[in-house]
Design a protein with these regions (language model features):
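Cell wall/extracellular polymer interaction/catalysis modules
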Residues: 19-171, 178-195
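Sec-dependent N-terminal signal peptides
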Residues: 4-13
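C-terminal, well-folded lobe of enzymatic/effector domains
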Residues: 198-199
Length: 200
């Protein structure tokens, strides 16, 4: 009987450990709700109804978290890395690489949640020398233009996942790899309507 209970306890411990390992693995994110909200928003505000950009800064910065979603095909056209802001100007931020902090405050170097309209294409001193101005559409990101928040590329950003390493930090701008920007640029130039970018 003792042996029986010993092996039973051993099996229970192994099962617990396996359960912990499975639970610790990050499950794929389901953005079905966000896609539906985004499409309705684009229709209501006369924005591009073919695709939009979704950035989930809740994910590890070494993993793909910039998604170009095709409304009609109902799938991601691209999944790539993107930076978040250092957010360390007005207070210390020891976890700045591990976790994105949000603020709409000017000069905060933080990322800001919410929906943006991708605006004018302009010259950039970074990456492939192209940037797009971002217009904040919500209270959480209304200072985007005052903060000079733009979508641009940067040589320091990898074009493929680098997890468990982290992507570099920006001053609040969503910066992508040069190769990714070369894909985004023609998409944006060819769009006859403004494109939605949504940061979670």
């Amino acid at each position: 009987n003792r042996n029986f209970f010993f092996y039973l306890g051993l099996l229970f411990c192994i099962a617990c450990q396996q359960g912990k390992q499975v639970g610790a693995q990050e499950l794929p994110k389901d953005y079905t709700t966000q896609h539906s909200i985004a499409l309705a928003y684009c229709k209501a505000h006369k924005m591009n109804e073919d695709f939009y950009f979704l950035i989930d800064l809740r994910l590890h910065s070494g993993k793909n978290r910039f998604f170009v979603y095709d409304f009609k095909q109902k799938k991601n056209l691209y999944e790539k890395l993107v930076t978040h802001g250092s957010c360390d100007v007005f207070s210390s931020n020891p976890d700045k690489f591990e976790k994105a902090q949000y603020s709409n405050q000017v000069n905060s170097h933080c990322s800001a949640k919410g929906k943006y309209k991708i605006g004018k294409r302009d010259y950039s001193s970074w990456g492939i020398k192209v940037k797009y101005w971002l217009e904040g559409l919500e209270e959480s990101n209304s200072n985007a233009q005052k903060r000079l928040i733009v979508l641009h590329s940067w040589e320091a950003v990898s074009d493929s996942e680098i997890y468990p390493d982290y992507s570099p930090l920006s001053w609040g701008c969503p910066a992508v790899s040069n190769a990714f920007m070369e894909l985004l640029d023609p998409l944006l130039q060819q769009s006859k309507k403004p494109v939605l970018l949504w940061i979670l």
